[in-house]
Amino acid sequence: MPEGEIQTDAIVRDALSRGKSVYIPFLHKTHLDPKESPARVMDMVQLKGIADYESLKRDKWGIPSIDPSTVNERHRILGGGVDGTAPDAIGLDLMLMPGVAFDYDEVTGHIRRLGHGKGFYDFFITRYARRYGNNPGHIPILLYGLALKEQFLVAPEDDTIPVGPLDEPPHGVILGDGTIKHTIAKISER
């Protein structure tokens, strides 16, 4: 799928070269109650720097992926891993999310995102909001989709990108041609 999605390599390298903290997805079996969560969940784990990023092996889609044997050596944004680290007091500033398609809802003013169907990002955002939502001074995470311009549908034929009650609307979407589409509705505090 690398040729069918926006590549994040330059974004990751630039952020790391500027000294930013960069977290990438790590999928794993969950220890959470199976009645309240999927069998596998996504956490965000920190990259240690450019050399660490370059050492990551690529998965079957060509995406650099964390070796499960190194997860306990890494900071996890939600904490609570096997190493028992606490979450950051501040949390994440921005999350870039993939999607199959995006559009604009004329009624609500939201950008709608059609994910890949597993709910990994939506469930992570829900867990993140529970962990950070009541922290004093916490600024809600900005959620932006990342897409090719062809993935942003203008007046889709069937009228709408399908979304469910658990789908988190992004604040906007950044397109491969440099265009940024913003939601105009106030998204509830996460």
Where do the PLM segments sit?
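N-terminal active-site beta-alpha-beta segment that forms phosphate/nucleotide-binding
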Residues: 1-87
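Surface-exposed, charge/polar-rich loops and edge strands
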Residues: 50, 62-95, 99-116, 122-190
